[in-house]
Amino acid sequence: MEVRVQNIRKEFGRFPALEDVSLDIRSGELIALLGPSGSGKTTLLRLVAGLESPTEGTIFFGDEDASKKTVQQRNIGFVFQHYALFRHMTVLDNVAFGLKVRPAKRRPSAADIRRRAVDLLELVQLSGLERRYPAQLSGGQRQRVALARAMAVEPNVLLLDEPFGALDAQVRKELRRWLREIHDRTGHTTIFVTHDQEEALELADRVVVMSKGAIEQVGTPDEIYDHPVSPFVYGFIGQSNCLDVTLANGEIWHEDRPIGLRAGNEPDGAATLYFRPHDVELIDGCGGCLAGLVTASRRVAGTRHLELDLGRKHPPVEIELPPERAASTDHTRIAFRPTRWKLFRKGGQKEAPLIEAEAPVLAATGT
């Protein structure tokens, strides 16, 4: 089922929770709404579900205007963060509940309801637990029951509101892989809300990055991570560093020295340089580079993260190096240069990047 959100505005009192939001979700797509608290992602999900009504704008399911329809009329499957299972019902009865309470004209036979519930429990790998109660299940098992219950009604759209937020890290990782497999097998149009960027990038076909009630960027995980279109997206997705720089005569300067990167034909003036900790190369000497004193070093999985003080009260930057390369750098001065970076002109969060580069394009010169 295709879902189209057109020019949606939602106000709570005088507070604009969403402002002119438009989004096309393809049939069978798994899409993530990602953003910090207060970005509007949960409000958008609730509007699609019919749990809230838009102040302005329209929501289409296929070619049909669903804006005035109830939750039941929209045929939505909803999975919440805290399961919302019926404690007094068995696993099988929880899964079958949505079918059992349908109006008589639309209700399948008891045999068909049981068959579908059993099939879904097999799909979510809970066969044999039909007679257990929620209190007898682990958190991961309860969330699987909640998903099976949502799918039992054969929903037009499946909505997941931070479904793994209450689970520990290892269980979340396992369920993410499992949910992607389930989606690929069933083909439901699925929208899920998360503040966990790793979860969004791993699971989704496309990611919708939201901030302050607006959509900042929509794209595949690769597009979002590798080609962020605004300072907000660059800073929110993954780890990043930003430096105040100056463009002068086609070169990029930090403080009082060029750093070995070209600014192309951009006019002179102030800008911000963004780069990721792993997108750097070390430089012998420092003719046209950045340099800083190592103030902290910590091991993170297969890399070592070094915190560098660039001086002049500038916020520290962080770079990542292989542990063996970083072993000799403790408390020493490191010269480096970004290998992949973006420039944004100062004064506009929405402005497109001035320059996007994947390698330094100006040889180091001078001292």
Swiss-Prot record:
Name its cellular compartments.
Answer: Cell inner membrane
Q: What is its EC number?
A: 7.3.2.3
**Major site of localization recorded for this protein:** membrane
> Which keywords does this chain's UniProt record carry?
ATP-binding, Cell inner membrane, Cell membrane, Membrane, Nucleotide-binding, Plasmid, Sulfate transport, Translocase, Transport
InterPro entries for this protein = AAA+_ATPase, ABC_SmlMolc_Importer, ABC_transporter-like_ATP-bd, ABC_transporter-like_CS, P-loop_NTPase, Sulph_transpt1, TOBE-like
Q: Give the matching Gene3D superfamilies.
A: P-loop containing nucleotide triphosphate hydrolases (3.40.50.300)
The ABC transporter domain sits at: 3-237
Has keyword S-adenosyl-L-methionine? no
Q: Which SUPFAM superfamilies match?
A: P-loop containing nucleoside triphosphate hydrolases
Regarding protein family, the annotation reads: Belongs to the ABC transporter superfamily. Sulfate/tungstate importer (TC 3.A.1.6) family.
Q: What is this protein called?
A: Sulfate/thiosulfate import ATP-binding protein CysA 2
- Does the record carry Transport as a key word? yes
Q: Which organism is it from?
A: Rhizobium meliloti (strain 1021)
Its function? Part of the ABC transporter complex CysAWTP involved in sulfate/thiosulfate import. Responsible for energy coupling to the transport system.
Q: How does it sit in the membrane?
A: Peripheral membrane protein
Where in the sequence is the signal peptide annotated?
none
